[in-house]
């Protein structure tokens, strides 16, 4: 079993299977969370933000893209509230290096320049007594389109992009169009709609 970059995952998989070994190789991630309007407000907002910000977003199962179906503004507003309560240095650690901090903040800036809306901005985060630390605050970016780099490339930081979808079919199409297929999730109180995502989404884990 391997989790890491796509380049190395291909090498591991090729070498393992050439010797008839069973292998699970997960390479890269851009995990999509499909959120429907009927999703439980507090639970959904809390889990999405925790998945985005936990380990400062430096984990393969972190939430990277939220696909909001129809009108989920009430959930987004709650997410903003949850994210603003996170304090770098207290309940959010640093990213791994100065280069990582610069790269992550570059994605946020690129999204802003491309027309996205920064709802919570983690750029320039500092911690008293640790001013030289590599901190990026939780970041929520709304009105993102699938072609923006912040939505299509792995960031590995506490950043989540929100893409709006008119209905569940469009949301599943957005998830399936991603070059990454590590994991996906669905937030709804409808078993039938959840089953549709489970059956139609192309992610390896749902």
Say what each PLM segment does.
Residues 34, 84, 131-206:
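Conserved C-terminal structural/oligomerization subdomain of aldehyde/semialdehyde dehydrogenase
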Residues 1:
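A structured beta-alpha segment of the ubiquitous adenosine-cofactor-binding alpha/beta core
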Residues 4-146, 174, 202:
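ALDH superfamily catalytic-core signature
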